């Protein structure tokens, strides 16, 4: 049984989602958003770090996954988003958690089946996959999507590793 913390970083709103993996089943544990104040960026980064550190203490995850960001609306936004990701990653590494990163396309593909899915489609599929009574808030749904993507990716790697040394007809497969 593994507990995965997924994070959708943002300098104003950082979503988080926690799932527990029992066998091949993913079970919802918790989710929400860290909403930073309108203070200067260094204080917002500290709020992200402190908020995720508390979530890590509360849920005791085994693994940490975060969305990798490739582009933003402008250079300033991209820099702030990168710094928010850094604050989140430092919170994870301070707790000795392994960190995995996934692109938005990978996450959407794992959750919806297409890398071009809309936010509402991700919310709907997260609700269905985790058997939630209602669709989670967009940032929390994205974070849960990161956790689900990490689960599926790690399961695929485990399956591949298990077959890596299987000999079939005199060749490795």
From Swiss-Prot:
<keyword id="KW-0233">DNA recombination</keyword>
<dbReference type="InterPro" id="IPR020563">
    <property type="entry name" value="X-over_junc_endoDNase_Mg_BS"/>
</dbReference>
<dbReference type="Pfam" id="PF02075">
    <property type="entry name" value="RuvC"/>
</dbReference>
<dbReference type="GO" id="GO:0006281">
    <property type="term" value="P:DNA repair"/>
</dbReference>
<dbReference type="InterPro" id="IPR036397">
    <property type="entry name" value="RNaseH_sf"/>
</dbReference>
<feature type="active site">
    <location>
        <position position="67"/>
    </location>
</feature>
<keyword id="KW-0255">Endonuclease</keyword>
<feature type="active site">
    <location>
        <position position="8"/>
    </location>
</feature>
<dbReference type="GO" id="GO:0006310">
    <property type="term" value="P:DNA recombination"/>
</dbReference>
<dbReference type="GO" id="GO:0003677">
    <property type="term" value="F:DNA binding"/>
</dbReference>
<keyword id="KW-0540">Nuclease</keyword>
<feature type="binding site">
    <location>
        <position position="139"/>
    </location>
    <ligand>
        <name>Mg(2+) 1</name>
    </ligand>
</feature>
<dbReference type="InterPro" id="IPR002176">
    <property type="entry name" value="X-over_junc_endoDNase_RuvC"/>
</dbReference>
<keyword id="KW-0238">DNA-binding</keyword>
<keyword id="KW-0378">Hydrolase</keyword>
<dbReference type="InterPro" id="IPR012337">
    <property type="entry name" value="RNaseH-like_sf"/>
</dbReference>
<dbReference type="GO" id="GO:0000287">
    <property type="term" value="F:magnesium ion binding"/>
</dbReference>
<comment type="similarity">
    <text>Belongs to the RuvC family.</text>
</comment>
<keyword id="KW-0234">DNA repair</keyword>
<dbReference type="GO" id="GO:0048476">
    <property type="term" value="C:Holliday junction resolvase complex"/>
</dbReference>
<dbReference type="GO" id="GO:0008821">
    <property type="term" value="F:crossover junction DNA endonuclease activity"/>
</dbReference>
<feature type="active site">
    <location>
        <position position="139"/>
    </location>
</feature>
<keyword id="KW-0963">Cytoplasm</keyword>
<feature type="binding site">
    <location>
        <position position="67"/>
    </location>
    <ligand>
        <name>Mg(2+) 2</name>
    </ligand>
</feature>
<comment type="subunit">
    <text>Homodimer which binds Holliday junction (HJ) DNA. The HJ becomes 2-fold symmetrical on binding to RuvC with unstacked arms; it has a different conformation from HJ DNA in complex with RuvA. In the full resolvosome a probable DNA-RuvA(4)-RuvB(12)-RuvC(2) complex forms which resolves the HJ.</text>
</comment>
<feature type="binding site">
    <location>
        <position position="8"/>
    </location>
    <ligand>
        <name>Mg(2+) 1</name>
    </ligand>
</feature>
<keyword id="KW-0479">Metal-binding</keyword>
<keyword id="KW-0460">Magnesium</keyword>
<protein>
    <recommendedName>
        <fullName>Crossover junction endodeoxyribonuclease RuvC</fullName>
        <ecNumber>3.1.21.10</ecNumber>
    </recommendedName>
</protein>
<comment type="function">
    <text>The RuvA-RuvB-RuvC complex processes Holliday junction (HJ) DNA during genetic recombination and DNA repair. Endonuclease that resolves HJ intermediates. Cleaves cruciform DNA by making single-stranded nicks across the HJ at symmetrical positions within the homologous arms, yielding a 5'-phosphate and a 3'-hydroxyl group; requires a central core of homology in the junction. The consensus cleavage sequence is 5'-(A/T)TT(C/G)-3'. Cleavage occurs on the 3'-side of the TT dinucleotide at the point of strand exchange.</text>
</comment>
<keyword id="KW-0227">DNA damage</keyword>
<dbReference type="GO" id="GO:0005737">
    <property type="term" value="C:cytoplasm"/>
</dbReference>
């Amino acid at each position: 049984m593994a507990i995965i913390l997924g994070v959708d970083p943002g300098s104003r709103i950082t979503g988080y989602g926690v799932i527990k993996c029992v066998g091949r089943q993913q079970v919802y544990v918790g989710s929400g958003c860290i909403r930073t104040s309108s203070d200067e960026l260094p204080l917002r980064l500290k709020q992200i770090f402190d908020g995720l550190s508390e979530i890590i203490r509360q849920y005791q995850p085994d693994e940490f996954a975060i969305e990798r960001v490739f582009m933003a609306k402008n250079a300033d936004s991209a820099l702030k988003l990168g710094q928010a990701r850094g604050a989140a990653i430092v919170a994870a590494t301070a707790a000795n958690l392994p960190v995995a990163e996934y692109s938005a396309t990978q996450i959407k593909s794992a959750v919806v089946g297409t890398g071009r899915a809309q936010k509402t489609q991700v919310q709907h599929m997260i609700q269905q996959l985790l058997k939630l009574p209602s669709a989670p808030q967009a940032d929390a749904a994205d974070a849960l999507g990161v956790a689900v993507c990490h689960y599926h990716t790690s399961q695929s790697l485990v399956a591949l590793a298990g077959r890596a040394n299987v000999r079939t007809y005199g060749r490795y497969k």
